[in-house]
Amino acid sequence: MSEALKRMAAEYRANAGLLLKRINELKSELAQTDCKTSDWTRLRGRIMILEILYADSISTARYLENYHGGN
């Protein structure tokens, strides 16, 4: 794997770590929020979007880590 791909994969993993940290912060806040409020709905929506971004970041990092080039 080229150094550029290694760096890119590391950046995606680092960003995924930041996303996961924020997801966990929001989940903690969600647990303390009444589920019958618009705040709960808003938080749940933000968490769902961040979870998608997290999954995409991990997927991209794995792809870059395992890319061998095609012929």
Residue ranges and their predicted role:
Residues 30-41:
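Charged, low-complexity interaction regions
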